[in-house]
Each structure stands twice: as C-alpha cells, then as structure tokens.
C-alpha cells in the first residue's frame, strides 16, 4: 500500500534525476523539465477523468472558484502544462505542487498555502480529492470540508468519518 503520505515531504525529480544520471555516468542533453515531461508521458500519458470538463464548466458558470493542490514530484511547469493542455478551459486560480513547495498532503501546510493564495478561511472551502489519507484526512485536518472522489481509484477506508463521496 501507498506509504509516501507518512513522510509528508516531497523530493522533486528535478533534484533526484540529476543525481541519478550523474552517479551512473549518464549524460542527457535535456533540461530537468524536459526529462520530467518524457518520464511522465511514458509512465502515464494522462487522460481527463470522465465528466471533469463538464463539472469544471459547471463550477465556472456558477462563479465557484477552483485551484489545484497536487502531490507530485514532477516540475511545477510540467504539471501546469499538462493540466492546461488536457483541460484548456479550466479556471484554476493556482496550481500548487508538492514538488515546488516541499510539503505533501496530508501536511496541513500545503492546505494553508492554498487558503492563503485564495484569501479564504478553511470553513469556506470544499476540497475534492481521490486519496483518502492525503486528500480527505489532510483537508479535514486543515479545517476544510472534504469530499472524497471515489471514481478515480477504489480504495477502502476503515475509519468512521462522516464525509461526502462522489
């Protein structure tokens, strides 16, 4: 099972891959961001979740503000490029990645940063995520209303917490 959430700290690929290649005597004529793009596209080409474009369009039409908090080791520019390419009509006010800010969900600091960027209080925010430990428990601990999106992955949970699921 996934255990990275226990550490709550991200080591970005832009730090790790240069070490990995240099320590093995491998020379690559690509920037760190280009390496991230190649690796991520090979590992997971990316496809929008079914219904996400309509859902984001609905939120936008109702004036509901949106942003992204992502636990990911790829460069922030690579993440933003992929999100904007796959969801070109998104209205995300910000994209926060653990690779850029060190802290991983469920660490409260990454949620606090999003609240600061949005200039909102925790009780004004609904947080939707697909990972129980990182998204649901993390946002709940930060005072946000967690909504667990269970359509992306099917993981059971054992705790008796009253949460919304979609």
Describe every region a protein language model picked out:
Residues 53, 57-60, 67-166:
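Asp-based, Mg2+/Mn2+-dependent phosphohydrolase catalytic module
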Residues 37-46:
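Surface-exposed cleft-lining segments at the edges of enzyme active sites
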């Amino acid at each position: 099972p996934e255990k990275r959430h226990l550490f709550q700290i991200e080591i970005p690929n832009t730090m790790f891959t240069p070490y990995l290649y240099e320590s093995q005597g491998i020379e690559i004529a690509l920037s760190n961001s280009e390496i991230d793009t190649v690796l991520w596209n090979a590992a997971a080409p990316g496809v929008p979740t079914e219904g996400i474009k309509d859902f984001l369009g609905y939120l936008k039409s109702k004036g509901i503000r949106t942003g992204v908090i992502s636990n990911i080791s790829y460069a922030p520019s690579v993440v933003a490029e992929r999100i904007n390419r796959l969801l070109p009509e998104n209205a995300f006010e910000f994209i926060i990645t653990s690779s850029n800010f060190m802290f991983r969900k469920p660490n409260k600091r990454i949620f606090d940063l999003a609240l600061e960027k949005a200039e909102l209080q925790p009780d004004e925010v609904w947080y939707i995520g697909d990972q129980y430990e990182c998204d649901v428990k993390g946002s709940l601990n930060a005072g946000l209303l967690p909504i667990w999106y269970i359509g992306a992955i099917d993981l059971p949970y054992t705790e008796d917490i009253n949460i919304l699921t979609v």
